[in-house]
Amino acid sequence: LGTWEAGVLKTDEGEWGTRCAVLAVRHKDTGPDFNVIRLGKVRKVACKCVEQSFEVGVDSGQAGFFDDAFYQNDTVFEELPAPGFAIGDLWYRHVCDITLSKMSAGVLHYGAVSSSGFGDGGYTCYTHADENGVIDFAFIVFI
């Protein structure tokens, strides 16, 4: 519940070019600052983040955080222009418009998405909980 913000850390990967290394979301009022990912030491964070036991599976070169109540609910796009990407269902096409943009990341109603570093695979997710045990910050490490 509440307002969430998203951030992406992009890194220069030489011949691979600039890639999305980390995608993060934080609760606007309680989550740790995005400096946690800007420092580039996300595997050794000082924010008391916990590595989750699941892998974030990627098979389309993109991953994101979404409000479960609205995930793949096409009604969130009713007021938006039609997506430019022409393959797949409406949700997928809108997400691809974001990940195929110059930024390779962005927000949509009830979510945030980015391209996934070097593409498909399994990636690690970390979370931070507030004093009540409610998750208020999460990020996926791609690179």
Residue ranges and their predicted role:
Residues 1-143:
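Intrinsically disordered, low-complexity acidic regions enriched in Pro/Ser/Thr
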